[in-house]
């Protein structure tokens, strides 16, 4: 595996690259990096593909524009098309996880001739509707804490997370794995059910040991990545959702045509 720095859409992305064959681009979510795909990269490369796992703009070794509007689905979609062009290919297969899911779904919708197949983990494809997801969240979670609404005011979540990266990353990762979900079901009055004036880390589930799917050295790598990049870029993706709604409103109810 090697790192390449790819100039695309006016910025530079860092990508982990391995293998030869049809192009597969892997897109991580939040809070993650190319490193999330570390176990899948060699397997897919060995199966006969060129695997390119990017750091999404705002993360890791990639450029980090400041403005919220630089983090729309449309902007990041154009980044991916530039990656395909960089490798001299006409098409690519896309994999996405978490925020990478909507990114690859809509890249496929907006660029039907450039994406041959697409797969997403954890976030399904949601066609555009008559309202922004943030409007729905404001109604559903009125008077309660919801992380995506908490992330909307610039600087607030950054001020909480950046001095506490280990706690933030461990809490985010561990609270939604099997052990964390079990604890949440055992105690309904948990960190997922708190007032709208709460902070993200208030009442989070913590564990003394690591689960079997990540070790401390791997977590330290991720912490170092976020110490370098900061949290503004990752959080701006959440803030860009109203602009996404405006950009994509003409695609209401459209289905993907690629194998998915």
PLM regions and their residue ranges:
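Conserved HGGG/HGGXW glycine-rich cap/lid loop of the alpha/beta-hydrolase fold
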Residues: 14-63, 83
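Conserved Rossmann-like nucleotide-binding pocket used by diverse enzymes
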Residues: 4, 26, 52, 95, ...
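Short, flexible hinge/linker loops that cap or flank conserved catalytic cores
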Residues: 7-9, 17-19, 254-256
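Generic structural signal for short, solvent-exposed loop/turn connectors between secondary structure elements
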Residues: 1-3, 19-21, 129-134
């Amino acid at each position: 595996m090697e790192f390449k720095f790819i100039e695309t859409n006016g910025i530079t992305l860092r990508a982990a690259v391995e293998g030869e064959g049809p192009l597969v681009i892997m897109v991580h979510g939040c809070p993650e990096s190319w490193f999330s795909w570390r176990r899948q990269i060699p397997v897919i490369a060995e199966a006969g593909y060129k695997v390119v796992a990017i750091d999404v703009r705002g993360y890791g070794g990639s450029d980090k524009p400041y403005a919220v509007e630089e983090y729309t689905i449309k902007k990041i979609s154009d980044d991916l098309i530039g990656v395909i062009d960089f490798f001299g290919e006409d098409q690519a297969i896309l994999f996405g996880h978490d925020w990478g899911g909507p990114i690859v779904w809509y890249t496929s919708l907006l660029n039907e001739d450039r994406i041959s197949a697409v797969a997403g983990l954890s976030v399904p494809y949601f066609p555009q509707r008559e309202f922004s997801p943030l409007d729905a969240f404001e109604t559903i979670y009125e008077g309660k804490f919801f992380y995506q609404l908490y992330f909307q005011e610039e600087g607030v979540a950054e001020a909480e997370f950046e001095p506490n990266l280990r706690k933030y990353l461990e809490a985010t990762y561990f609270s939604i794995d099997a052990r964390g979900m079990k604890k949440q079901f055992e105690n309904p009055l948990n960190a997922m059910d708190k007032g709208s004036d709460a902070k993200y880390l208030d009442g989070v589930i913590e564990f003394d040991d690591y689960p079997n799917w990540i070790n401390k050295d791997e977590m330290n790598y991720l912490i170092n990545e976020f110490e370098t990049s900061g949290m503004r870029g990752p959080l701006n993706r959440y803030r860009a959702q109203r602009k996404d709604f405006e950009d994509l409103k003409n695609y209401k109810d459209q289905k993907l045509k690629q194998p998915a």
